[in-house]
């Protein structure tokens, strides 16, 4: 009975109490903006509720996260007690479940990845998990959830994006109940998938105590599963590597006990991430003790191309923060920071070959470090200039055709999404929108690093971005999250919407 209660509390249930939703405002065409001030429950798509502490029990039996959707398959990562028998049943019609996977028995407490294959493309599926605990004769069915296979070109769809969640910074820029509300709001919008922009698994604080690395890093990833197992049961997740994950080349030392290896393996263990195949392109190189990194990748969906970049696994130096180091970012030689030749050539080929009308590029931040958006774009391998203004791209990146920004301009990238700065900022440079994505659970509602932004629409935390992709235009909506209370500043509740053609 206790296990069943845990399952009900934390498995695939989407709880919509404590949330308020309204009809989304219609954005004007032609790239114009529309701002709407939220007014309590019913204003601006906000997530409301009481600031009650969230109970974080161990990951519940049946906790499920979806990933790696294709035109014919999807992968479910499921936590099950050892000896539990289970299967997934599904159908294109709600409540019918005419198809099912083979039964499987959990061999350990670690998540199991189950491939749901031979699906129809451009289709919505409804599914539920059924499982039978050891020494039990009855199967337990989870609530119904859903997913979509690849949308064909010309079909409208939506996706979501959140910035750095930083669950280790509770009281400073994270509140567990606000995070839950944001994720519940995401599920209610029903995007086809959801991007997390990095700094969701902070490993920095464990670097000074190697004896704690494995258990501590495992705990960081388990913590996110407790939240994402609810929301993630609907939209599949795509992760972007951040600086605080410390999944980084500079830490490699040839052993299987260093932080980068442990973090890289935990990332793949707890979340189903894309590897190069017939549907996804990406990083084909392997790292000793980790294998495929699954760090950068690309795919097409509907009228759009999605590209995820990563400098951390490909730079010989610490890209951003190196715990214990007193070196300031401004004194670093950022020509040493790179996505590497292989990733650059892959990016160039991917952008040039795609015929998608809309192209979206994701990275934790411009160059993986610093603050600001378009303010950072002119420099180093991103824009070609050194800090003194000298154009030195050819000297430092021989063989590269163009700096990354110019490559995006030439290939008509629609939006570049980044996290890291803990702020909402929409800017434009040479026709490319630079979109900084806000924290999803900052109950202080601060516009961190605002001073680094000299242009654009700037708003404080918190919430997520809901992006609707149509045949002719893209609509981006900043869906705000806050607790229902009095005297909130307008900039805390203001919903920002813009369109791109």
Where are these regions (language model features)?
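Bacterial N-terminal signal peptides that target proteins for export
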Residues: 1-8
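Bacterial N-terminal signal peptides
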Residues: 8-17
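Metal-dependent phosphoester/phosphodiester hydrolase catalytic core
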Residues: 42-448, 456-459, 466-501
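Disordered, low-complexity segments in secreted/periplasmic proteins that are enriched in proline
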Residues: 21-50
């Amino acid at each position: 009975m206790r296990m069943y209660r845990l399952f009900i509390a934390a498995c695939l249930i989407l709880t919509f109490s404590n949330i308020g939703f309204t009809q989304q405002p219609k954005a004007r065409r032609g790239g114009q903006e529309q701002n709407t001030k939220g007014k309590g429950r019913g204003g601006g798509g906000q997530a409301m509720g009481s600031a009650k502490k969230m109970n974080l029990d161990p990951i519940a039996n049946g906790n499920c996260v979806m990933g790696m959707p294709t035109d014919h398959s999807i992968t479910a990562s499921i936590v099950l007690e050892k000896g539990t028998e289970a299967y997934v049943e599904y159908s294109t019609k709600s409540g019918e479940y005419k198809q099912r996977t083979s039964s499987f028995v959990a061999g350990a407490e670690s998540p199991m990845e189950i491939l749901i294959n031979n699906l129809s493309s451009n289709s919505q599926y409804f599914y539920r998990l059924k499982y039978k605990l050891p020494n039990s004769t009855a199967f337990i069915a989870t609530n119904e959830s859903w997913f979509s296979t690849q949308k064909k070109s010309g079909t409208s769809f939506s996706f979501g994006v959140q910035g750095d969640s930083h669950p280790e910074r509770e009281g400073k820029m994270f509140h567990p109940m606000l995070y839950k509300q944001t994720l519940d709001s995401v599920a209610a919008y029903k995007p086809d998938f959801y991007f997390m922009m990095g700094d969701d698994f902070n490993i920095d604080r464990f670097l000074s105590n190697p004896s704690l690395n494995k258990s501590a890093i495992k705990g960081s990833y388990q913590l996110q599963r407790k939240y994402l197992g609810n929301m993630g049961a609907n939209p599949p997740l795509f992760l972007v590597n951040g600086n605080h994950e410390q999944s980084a080349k500079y830490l490699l030392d040839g052993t299987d006990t260093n932080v980068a290896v442990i973090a890289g393996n935990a990332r793949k263990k707890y979340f189903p991430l894309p590897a190069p195949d017939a549907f996804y392109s990406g990083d084909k190189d392997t790292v000793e003790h980790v294998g495929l990194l699954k760090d950068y990748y690309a795919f097409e969906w509907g009228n759009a191309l999605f590209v995820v970049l990563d400098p951390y696994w490909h730079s010989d130096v610490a890209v951003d923060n190196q715990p214990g180091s007193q070196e300031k970012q401004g004194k670093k030689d950022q020509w040493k920071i790179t996505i590497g030749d292989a990733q650059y050539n892959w990016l160039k080929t991917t952008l040039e070959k795609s015929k998608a009308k809309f192209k979206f590029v994701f990275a934790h931040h411009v160059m993986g470090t610093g603050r600001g958006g378009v303010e950072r774009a002119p420099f180093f391998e991103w824009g070609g200039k050194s800090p003194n203004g000298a154009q030195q791209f050819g000297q430092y990146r021989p063989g590269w055709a163009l700096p990354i920004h110019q490559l995006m301009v030439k290939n008509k990238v629609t939006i570049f999404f980044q996290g890291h700065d803990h702020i909402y900022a929409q800017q434009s440079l040479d026709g490319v929108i630079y979109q900084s994505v806000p924290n999803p659970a900052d109950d202080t509602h601060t516009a961190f690093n605002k001073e680094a932004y000299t242009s654009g629409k700037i708003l404080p935390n918190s919430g997520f971005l809901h992006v609707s992709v149509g045949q002719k235009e893209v609509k981006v909506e900043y869906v705000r999250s806050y607790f229902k209370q009095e005297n909130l500043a307008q900039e805390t509740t203001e919903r920002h919407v813009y369109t791109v053609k």
